[in-house]
Structures are given as C-alpha cells and as structure tokens.
A protein has these predicted regions:
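Short secondary-structure boundary/capping elements
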Residues: 43-46, 68-72
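Short amphipathic alpha-helical segments and helix-helix/interface helices
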Residues: 23, 77, 99-100
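Basic, amphipathic alpha-helical patches used to engage nucleic acids or provide basic targeting signals
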Residues: 72-82
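Non-catalytic C-terminal interaction segments of nucleic acid-processing enzymes
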Residues: 1-6, 24-27, 106-145
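Conserved catalytic cores of phosphodiester-cleaving nucleases, focusing on short active-site segments
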Residues: 22, 51-53, 57-69
Length: 145
C-alpha cells in the first residue's frame, strides 16, 4: 500500500470512506506506486481538489469524491480538467446513463465505489497548457515537503 506519511482526510467524513478503496484500486492497477506524489484536499486555483496525483512521468490526475451529487462532482471535475492530465469522479453509486454521457463528452472519468471500486468510464487524456502543467507539477512537488 502507498505510504502517505500522515492520515489522509477529506472535509467530509462520509466521503472519506471512498478514499481507501480508491487508493487500493489505483495501486492494484499500478496507476500509483511509491514514487507517486499524492495529496488530498490540494489547494489549486482558489479551490480544493479532493485527491491530486503526480506520477513519475509528470502526469497529473484529479479525483473528486462525492456521495450522490453527480452534477456537482461533474462540475468540479470539469474545472480540474483544465489543469490536470486526467480528471475523475469517484462516487458511491452508479450514475444515470445521461450523467455518464455528460462525463464522457467532457472527458471526465467515473469510478464507482460500492462493494469494490470499478472504473465505469475512463478519463480522457487532456492537452494542458505547458505553463499550467509546469506550475501544477511544481506546486504538487513543493506541497509534498
């Protein structure tokens, strides 16, 4: 399992229950490893990203954890998409087909955590401004220390 160096938390205690299964799934798929920089409640552009990752190839990913409120999660994930290489929603139940269509059209991935997490829709790889990507990568590295 990935070592955090501190106990990860979220602002919402109920949403925090989505975090351990998400991290376990990411590790089991080898999407994260010991060199991955992982932040929760990462401050970025005047908002907080629930979980932000920086991989060894400087690829970034943002995850919005939500219970039920798919519309709000999609809105936040779309903001994240402007700065992160991949943007995901992690939710506790299967969204309606129309909601999945909205996510798909906008390049946002969906992970459903019920008995075990599963990827319902893969996030598209975004083309990020090199200036934004460099700034985000630097901030993720600095915030780690």
């Amino acid at each position: 399992m990935i070592e955090w160096g501190h106990e990860p938390t979220t602002r919402n205690a109920e949403e925090a229950a989505l975090l351990p299964p998400l991290l376990e799934m990411l590790a089991s798929r080898r999407w994260i490893n010991e060199s991955t920089i992982i932040h929760n409640e990462f401050a970025w552009n005047g908002r907080r990203v629930d979980v932000a990752l920086l991989g060894k190839r400087n690829r970034t990913a943002a995850f919005e954890l939500k219970l039920g409120s798919f519309g709000r999660a999609l809105e936040q994930a779309m903001y994240n998409r402007l700065s992160f290489d991949r943007s995901w929603i992690v939710i506790d139940g299967m969204p309606k087909p129309v909601s999945l269509d909205y996510a798909s059209v906008n390049g946002v991935g969906v992970i459903v955590v019920t008995d075990r997490p599963r990827v319902v829709l893969r996030a598209g790889l975004q083309t990020i401004s090199p200036v934004v990507a460099k700034r985000l990568s630097a901030q993720l590295k600095v915030a780690r220390q």
